[in-house]
Amino acid sequence: MRGKLITLEGIDGSGKSTVAKKLQENSELRVFEPVFTREPTRGTLTGNAVENAIQSDTDQLAELFLFTADHAEHLAKLVKPALEDGKTVISDRYSDSRYAYQGITLKNRLDNPLEWVRDLHRGWTVIPDLTFLFDIEPEIAVKRCGKRGEQTKFEKIEFLRGVRELFLGLAAEEPERFVIVDASGSPEDVEKAVVQKILDFVQRIE
């Protein structure tokens, strides 16, 4: 039986990646041996190219294609093989991040960037079975980002407002796939809520 793909999404500063790390250490989840991964990938040719683009003034379209190339490589080398092996894959960021983030970065370049980016993925990407959207007010998120040190170009409040709006729009379109998580609480409380939802989901499909 094909495995299931679970993704974690949210704006920068939502605490998503902090919770993703906690999930890897969670004893309740270890029972079904999930495969943990992330986008952009780390230590790969495509992932390194994306990280360099994020830290530089790369053209927005070029940046999109770098993200998409990394996604394709990620699917081919890790996600699809793991799913075909019947494993549950949990990814910190996935295609919805591209739809929301590049939907904003390209708004002055394309008439409908969100749909354009989605069309770019149709026919070859793997749609997640369950997506957690870590929702938080951009003002709180930016403060959290500031505590981490130097901010990236994506960690600006007006930009994150637009990204959050697109994320919530995506969730409204597919309520059966998305679970909106209040990310304003402590990482421990958020982790507990997410773990319970994952366990419920896994038990339901077994």
Curated annotation (Swiss-Prot):
Alphabetical list of Pfam families matching this protein: Thymidylate_kin
Q: What CDD domains has UniProt attached to this entry?
A: TMPK
Which UniProt keywords are listed? Answer: ATP-binding, Kinase, Nucleotide biosynthesis, Nucleotide-binding, Transferase
**What EC numbers are recorded for this enzyme?**
2.7.4.9
* TM regions (residue ranges): none
A GO BP entry is: dTTP biosynthetic process
As its record notes, the protein acts as a catalyst of:
dTMP + ATP = dTDP + ADP
Name the residues that bind ATP: 10-17
Would you say which domain of life the source belongs to?
Archaea
Q: Which GO terms describe its cellular component?
A: cytoplasm
Q: Which Gene3D superfamilies match?
A: P-loop containing nucleotide triphosphate hydrolases
Report if keyword Nucleotide-binding is assigned: yes
Q: Which GO terms describe its molecular function?
A: ATP binding; dTMP kinase activity
NCBIfam families in the record: DTMP_kinase (TIGR00041)
Q: Which family does it belong to?
A: Belongs to the thymidylate kinase family.
What is the protein's name according to its record?
A: Probable thymidylate kinase
Q: Which gene encodes it?
A: tmk
